[in-house]
Amino acid sequence: MRGKLLSFSLFGESHGKAVGVLVEGLPPGIEVSVEELKRELERRKGIERFATKRKETDEPKILSGVFRGRTTGTPVAVIVENRDVDSSYYEEIRNTPRPGHADYPAGIKYFGYNDYRGGGHFSGRLTVGVVIAGYFAKKLLEREGIKVRAYLKRIGRVEAHVSPEELLSSENPYCPDEGAFEAMVEEMERARKAGDSVGGIVEAVAFNVPPGLGGPWEEDIEADIASALFRIPAVKGVEFGLGFGLAELRGSQANDPFVLKDGKVVTETNNHGGVLGGMTTGMPLVVRAAFKPTPSIYLPQRTVDLGRMEEVTLKLRGRFDSCIVPKALPVVESSVAFVIADHLLRRRAWEGMVR
């Protein structure tokens, strides 16, 4: 992901030696804790019962850009080794693209030279690097009092109803709405027992974001966040505030009236999710990402044998997630945090010149 001042690039494959990330543009002096970073990566493993049986330790190795516990201002390179890999089954299905996966278009794009094992470079395994990049962005935002929190808004047809205040104070790492969370677990369990999978929605809220970040057209922070979220494997929809729900309202209902509170300009409602004209308003920035069900399931599916050019039935074997959405929470947080951090650095550069 390339911002104007802050960027990261991912490398590695699901069944390669390692995955990793190169983060560029970080200011010097940001305090770094490997233990904190490990905890962020641990969150990415999700709920064990519904996650893949592949067990990775996810030990980050910082290769450059950090000295004596602080960023140096030069590029930060971090790798995480893949230690629990079983590629044998993928040799059996290399000519039969898995429905819902990137196998077929990837084979066409790379003329058959792509690493197809476990999805290769298209695998969700690469989100390890996103979480690492997001960790550094979050540390930068901490200095400004900005926090990004995400929770399970929906799993299947079960939806949670959570206020921003509840999200900040909750100790449940997945969803502050305890009743809804219990129903979500049941929904995931039903899919698991059926050999199937289920999707869902992650809602992220960024608190204490100052007004004025972003801009029109190419500077649009909403567009940048949407772009970052769509880069996450399995994301098929993004909306801010009420999103598509705004299409059902009249302007008198949709508009967020401006009022004064403790001497500050705020809005009575936050239907637009803290963004107007591509710029932050100072209200909590609210965004949701919709995740499709995991395409790897244990039920028979139709596909084509590309070697024989005939339709066949594919019944997958392997180690699959019945629901990837809980694992996506830190990935969504990281993506949102990284974009906000980039826009914050841009704003600070302007302030330095204007003032």
UniProtKB/Swiss-Prot annotation:
SUPFAM superfamilies assigned to the protein according to its UniProt record, in alphabetical order: Chorismate synthase, AroC
Cofactor(s) listed: FMNH2
Physiological role: This reaction introduces a second double bond into the aromatic ring system.
Source organism superkingdom: Archaea
Keywords: Amino-acid biosynthesis, Aromatic amino acid biosynthesis, FAD, Flavoprotein, FMN, Lyase, NADP
Family to which this protein belongs: Belongs to the chorismate synthase family.
GO cellular component, one term: cytosol
Protein name: Chorismate synthase
Catalytic activity: 5-O-(1-carboxyvinyl)-3-phosphoshikimate = chorismate + phosphate
Coiled-coil residue spans: none
Family annotation (CDD domains): Chorismate_synthase (cd07304)
Any one GO MF annotation of this record: chorismate synthase activity
One GO-annotated biological process of the protein: amino acid biosynthetic process
Pathway linked to the protein: Metabolic intermediate biosynthesis; chorismate biosynthesis; chorismate from D-erythrose 4-phosphate and phosphoenolpyruvate: step 7/7
Record Pfam families: Chorismate_synt
Enzyme Commission no: 4.2.3.5
